[in-house]
Amino acid sequence: LYEGFPNAMAEAVCLGIPCIATDFHAGAREILAPDIADSAVQIEEMTEVEYGILVPLCSGQKYRGKEPLERAEQELVKAMTLLLQDSEKRDYYKHKTSSRAKMLTIEGSVNRWLEIISE
């Protein structure tokens, strides 16, 4: 069972907060990368997409603190470091998420459904 729509991410986007998300089963792609939302290909490395950054899904295995990070965790570190150190990239995604927020309104959703139905 998976949550169909990540409300916290949608709220962050509406507030203009740059987002990093794992490429989980539902929601993140639809919000951050609508152009590839239908792709079945899983993200294998940190990927800058239109409205944020997607990283691979972690295994969920629990490790002790001294064990090395798994590859997906290293990709998450890269994404976090990028946004922390690159103010231009951070500002770019602040602007992009603000424009994406306008599409996440009720009106935007209704218009998109009407487009789909009329096709």
Question: Which residues does each PLM region occupy?
Answer:
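Short alpha-helical segment that forms part of, or immediately flanks, the ligand-binding pocket
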Residues: 6-14, 29-33
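Active-site donor-sugar recognition loop in glycosyltransferases
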Residues: 1-4, 26-27
